[in-house]
Regions:
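Charged, amphipathic alpha-helical segments
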Residues: 1-3, 33-41
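Short aromatic-glycine-(Arg/Gly/Cys) micro-motifs in beta-strand/loop hairpins
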Residues: 2-25
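Short acidic, gly/pro-rich beta-turn/loop elements at beta-sheet edges
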Residues: 18, 29, 65-67
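A short, exposed loop/beta-hairpin motif centered on an aromatic-Gly-Thr core
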Residues: 21-36
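Low-complexity, intrinsically disordered/propeptide-like segments
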Residues: 24, 39-40, 60
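Short, solvent-exposed helix-to-loop capping segments enriched in aromatics
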Residues: 43-45
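Short, mixed-charge low-complexity intrinsically disordered segments
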Residues: 47-67
Length: 67
């Protein structure tokens, strides 16, 4: 099974924080911390179901693996 890569980034005209998984977009968070918390929770749930998961933070042109 492929790795589930949750990406936390800003999106839209208002630059709201969102979590993406492939082409799916989840949430419109007011801050980065809330988006990261939800992404890490989702990744942990995936790992508990036997999947491999990662969380990446994309801010401007820099990406960092968080989990």
């Amino acid at each position: 099974m492929p790795v589930m890569k949750f990406r936390v980034c800003r999106q839209g005209r208002e630059a709201r924080w969102v979590v993406t998984l492939g082409a799916a977009v989840y949430g419109a968070y007011l801050d980065q911390e809330q988006a990261l918390l939800d992404a890490v929770d989702a990744a942990r749930d995936a790992i508990q179901r036997g999947r491999e998961a990662q969380v990446w933070l994309w801010d401007h042109s820099v990406s960092s693996r968080i989990f």
